[in-house]
């Protein structure tokens, strides 16, 4: 019936065999087919870019994305799993720019947008084969053939529908705004894209500049850390309620205005200045000053070069006075509110100064800093130069500094729907839960309008056409609309194709498309609709699969995909786009740093799989903090430990069963009688039924951490308790009912455990199932239903009793170990002290098990410790000090002289009276500090409410019995070294040794039974090995297979 199982197995090879089995027999396809027509479970797969290979950061969510759909499929649901590709956007363009050696927008336009886009199309799916191979090798089942791509015509058309729907709801607008801008990509980024990048600590020049007040020989000392913005200075800001001082600089003989609190930063010596006047910032409002440069003097008549008050000004650093230019968001808002100045942005697409700033024309703004400083110095307007260390955002694609600049952009009005977004978040089950109100919730509360346009080429074009004469806008939501208006057939919606599409306006001009493309995050956020070509296809079915039941991605997506899904789902349908989400953390290198190919600080994940297996890697990842959105410091040894401590023990349990089942020709019956009489059988059956109940509850709640914890706890119970304690039931030669019960119980347990583990470790469970399944069972473990609990088999009382028994045994074994008393050495007595009568009854019921596990001859169950310890007492000064006053010393001395009986009286809740100088004092338990002293030959340990004592006095009989057990262990090792089968009978040879003779005379039958020895012969001529039984005794023994 069963195939023989090797004890040693190479798990990666086994997994390759299982992959072949799944592929040859189309098991994934069959799992999908058999659930057609069943309840739909909707899962969205966030689209990765295929311009790079998958790394550890992808392995975590892809493991989660496999576990949940496998589980839900086994629960009878139909779970469609389509892989998707993010094919547009900055990552793709940046790769093409590098490969074509192009730099910046101008060179791309010179190269040709049509050719550039074609190159993007060619490389965008560069690594799809590698992705498929690696994700499949991880064990993930997903449909790669019916994938979606954001560059597909149908996908792009649905994105246009999303855009137009928002446009018609008044949620899309065009405006100038200060945005983070990537000079290398020549495009603005959204605020959440900035958070996807890195903030680095950089040194920038910190300048204090002299601004001359108009018509006065007085200067404002203003502070900036962005010298390159000074040529576009249009105003100065002060704090309305901040105190300012007008001072005379004694050395320079000039008058300066500065924040009073900042004087000591600029003047360490108070004798170097004289305070002329002090006032609030409100006093300065509206005062005019002379511009630093003459580039934009024409803006004075529009309100430029005046002092404004602003709440963001502080005296924490600088001078308490800041310069205003249109390159800061707060600055821009002040200018917009208080002036009519033009939008001054004298920099090009690559952030180089234009001819408007003639002195620095052609210089990249950050490179112009030093030249601007030199210019100001020559004009005697530089008061002080320092260096300023601060955190600054870098582009998440080019790793270069971002520049904040005003730019015309298209926005989604988040402010209008913010309250609805917060309500949508309430509908989401976040794992871990703290993200709902924490990272994601706070992000929503502070969300700004979303800049969705990019000044790029390879993306989904913004579907707005403007009249060249009137500026009138038409928003297009489908190909059909565009075809009707233009009279042209539309087969591609990319920029290089549709920018050529125009039509005459009834106002006399021409309708021309706005030049920008959509942020690729708008596309991935549209994935629920666009991947289904909604609303152009199967519109009536869509509401049945929206919102998604489940999604999973990394923590960074709280400000990425999770965010855009929530925005668009709320804006379109006023509900969230997903109900449940598992969020994983970052996988870092073992030193806590970001994994980096250049640093070579991690092992290639495929090499890990080829060494330890995908099951071991999957388990390692989902057992780690990364599953709870925390960071994981990855370690190869961690995966190795999972193989050693979990995968191999599962295999060993399976191997043990198969080995003896083959010997005894055990044939499983699908209708096993589960109502057993053996307490171990009843216990493990109850445990596995409880496990089924807990797992179904926890995985239904997406709590993989708890799920894996209870699974691993059960595996430990199965291996280290049930199988270990049941071994003799399988070893014995006779086939009685107890042996049959043991086989049936272990078979049932193993098979059900494999079914429960199947979504987590799909390879190992498949291999074991293939050998355990009976003739008429499902072809694959993954075609089965997930096990449901048989509640009448759950015996909570028995589980509690066994758990308590194991706890007592664990404490007692720890006590033996702490005193170097080997478990094979028997002891006379174990004392167990507990006042709990229920626990005492359990101990009596489990006496046989406890004696075997502790290797003791008798057990004494008591309510108090008198037989184990004697007591001494000391005064509890903290308690007694306030009561005793001057008699404290005398009472404390009397307490140290209390007898053991006196102290016992106090322990039992009585008062003990001490008389000092005719004064009586009633001493209670809280007045003393107890000291326990072990009685002779006893070792005692106390944990929680349990005290355990071991009688360590070893008689000769106990000593010999311990040696007999050591002898048995040595013989068993010899059997293994000789590669004997577990059923092979042997002849045991010994020399004529006095101690050995004593051992054999006392324990011959026991030794024969345990080692399968037919006879024990004294034969000095045989090749014997010298082996140590303990530190002082060595014996010579040998074994030979019995051929009869």
Swiss-Prot record:
Subcellular location: Cytoplasm
UniProt source species: Borrelia duttonii (strain Ly)
GO molecular function annotations of the record: aminoacyl-tRNA deacylase activity; ATP binding; isoleucine-tRNA ligase activity; tRNA binding; zinc ion binding
Recorded family membership: Belongs to the class-I aminoacyl-tRNA synthetase family. IleS type 2 subfamily.
Note on domains (UniProt): IleRS has two distinct active sites: one for aminoacylation and one for editing. The misactivated valine is translocated from the active site to the editing site, which sterically excludes the correctly activated isoleucine. The single editing site contains two valyl binding pockets, one specific for each substrate (Val-AMP or Val-tRNA(Ile)).
Name of the protein described by the UniProt record: Isoleucine--tRNA ligase
NCBIfam families linked to this entry: ileS (TIGR00392)
Enzyme Commission number(s) from the entry: 6.1.1.5
Segments crossing the lipid bilayer: none
Function: Catalyzes the attachment of isoleucine to tRNA(Ile). As IleRS can inadvertently accommodate and process structurally similar amino acids such as valine, to avoid such errors it has two additional distinct tRNA(Ile)-dependent editing activities. One activity is designated as 'pretransfer' editing and involves the hydrolysis of activated Val-AMP. The other activity is designated 'posttransfer' editing and involves deacylation of mischarged Val-tRNA(Ile).
Binding site for ATP: 597
Top EC group: ligase
Cofactor names: Zn(2+)
This protein's encoding gene: ileS
Pfam families named among the record's database cross-references: Anticodon_1, DUF5915, tRNA-synt_1
